[in-house]
A protein has these predicted regions:
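Active-site glycine-rich loops that stabilize anionic/oxyanionic intermediates
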Residues: 31-32, 39-44, 247
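The serine-hydrolase catalytic nucleophile loop
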Residues: 41-53
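Conserved alpha/beta-hydrolase
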Residues: 55-74
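Conserved acidic catalytic loop of the alpha/beta-hydrolase fold
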Residues: 83-101
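Alpha/beta-hydrolase
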Residues: 147-232
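Short beta-strand/loop motif that positions the catalytic acidic residue
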Residues: 237, 243-245, 249
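Conserved alpha/beta-hydrolase "acid-adjacent" motif
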Residues: 250-256
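Catalytic active-site module of serine/aspartate enzymes centered on a nucleophile-bearing elbow/loop
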Residues: 267-298
C-alpha cells in the first residue's frame, strides 16, 4: 500500500473546443500507457495516492480530469454524462493520446467511466468501477435503488434551490476551515470509511477543497446530472469492466452491484470483506496491477 505522503502530481489545463477550460492532474510519465480516472462526488482529481515508483513499474500514467466547476475546470451548467465524456475525449486529443486507454471511476465517477466507455467505445480498452454507484435517473436502475437514494434523488430534483444553497455553504467551509470541515465529515461517517479517511485525511481534505471550488457550482451540477436520465445505456459498454466493492460500504451498499455486473455482460466483481467506500485507497497497488494487465503492452 502506498504511504499517504505528499507527492508531486502535475496540474494541467486544456482548452476545450467550445472555449472552456478543463483542469486535470497527471500522475506519472506522459510516455507511459494512459488511464483516465474519474473522481468521486464533491471531490477532484487530487484524490489519488502519488506513488511514482508503482506507476513506473507498471508503465502507467494516470490522467484525473476535474469535472466542470471543479478545480481549474470552467463551470458548465449544462453538464451531462455524455457532455463530460466528450470533454475527456477532447482532453485525450489535446494530449496526443489517440489509442484506447484504461478508465477508472470511484463512486459516482464510476457512472462517468461507464458513459465514456459507452459513448466512445473505440477510446476505451478496459475499465474498473471502484465503489461505484448507479445512475440515479435511469428508469431501470431506479427500481434497484435503496429507499434512501430514492429520497435523495427526489430531494435534489424537488428542492434544487436548497441543495444549491447547501453546496454554496459547504464551499465556504472548505475554503475557510478545511481541517474543521473534514473533521466534521469524519464524525458523520460509518466505521469503515472513518478509519480510511483518518489515515488519508490531508489528501482527501485538499481534494474536497478543490472539488468545492467555484462556490460549489460544480458539485451541484454534478448532482443534477446524476439525478437526470443518463443519456447512455449501460449495455452500450463494450470494453471489459471489473468491479471492486466493499461489503461494509456505508455510502453505497453492495446489494445492487451484482445487478450492474449482469448488465455489463457478467463483469467480474470483487466484494472485499470489512472494507468500505474508500477501498480504492486501501487497494491502490492491486487495482493498478489489475489495470496494467488489462491494457495492451505499449
Amino acid at each position: 500500500m502506498p504511504h499517504p505522503a505528499a507527492g508531486s502530481p502535475t496540474p494541467l489545463a486544456i482548452a476545450l473546443p467550445d472555449g472552456r477550460q478543463l483542469g486535470l492532474t497527471r500522475y506519472g510519465n506522459p510516455a507511459h500507457r494512459a488511464v483516465v480516472f474519474h473522481h468521486g462526488f464533491g471531490s477532484s482529481g487530487r484524490e489519488l495516492p502519488d506513488d511514482a515508483a508503482l506507476l513506473v513499474r507498471l508503465q502507467l500514467q494516470i490522467l484525473a480530469p476535474d469535472r466542470p466547476g471543479v478545480g481549474q475546470s470552467s463551470v458548465y451548467r449544462a453538464l451531462t454524462f455524455p457532455s463530460f465524456a466528450d470533454d475527456v475525449v477532447a482532453m485525450l486529443d489535446a494530449l496526443g493520446i489517440g489509442g484506447p486507454v484504461g478508465v477508472m471511476g470511484w463512486s459516482v465517477g464510476g457512472v462517468h467511466a461507464l458513459a465514456l466507455a459507452a459513448r466512445h467505445p473505440a477510446r476505451v480498452a478496459a475499465g474498473q468501477l471502484l465503489s461505484t454507484c448507479l445512475p440515479l435517473g435511469e428508469r431501470a436502475a431506479y427500481h434497484h435503488l435503496s429507499p434512501l437514494w430514492k429520497a435523495l434523488r427526489w430531494g435534489q430534483l424537488s428542492f434544487s434551490w436548497l441543495n444549491r444553497t447547501t453546496f454554496l455553504w459547504l464551499s465556504r467551509q472548505w475554503a475557510r476551515h478545511p481541517d474543521r470541515t473534514i473533521a466534521w465529515f469524519i464524525r458523520l461517517m460509518f466505521p469503515a470509511e472513518k478509519i480510511v479517511t483518518r489515515r488519508w485525511r490531508a489528501l482527501l481534505r485538499d481534494a474536497a477543497g478543490a472539488g468545492f471550488a467555484h462556490h460549489g457550482r460544480g458539485v451541484f451540477d454534478d448532482a443534477q446530472a446524476w439525478c437526470r436520465p443518463p443519456g447512455f445505456r449501460i449495455e452500450e459498454v463494450q470494453a471489459p469492466m471489473r468491479l471492486w466493492h466493499g461489503q461494509a460500504d456505508g455510502v453505497w451498499a453492495p446489494s445492487n452491484i451484482p445487478y450492474l455486473a449482469e448488465r455489463l455482460g457478467g463483469a467480474p466483481v470483487r466484494l472485499l470483506p470489512a472494507q468500505g467506500h474508500m477501498l480504492y485507497l486501501e487497494n491502490w497497488t492491486a487495482i493498478l496491477e489489475e489495470m496494467a494487465g488489462l491494457l495492451p503492452v505499449s
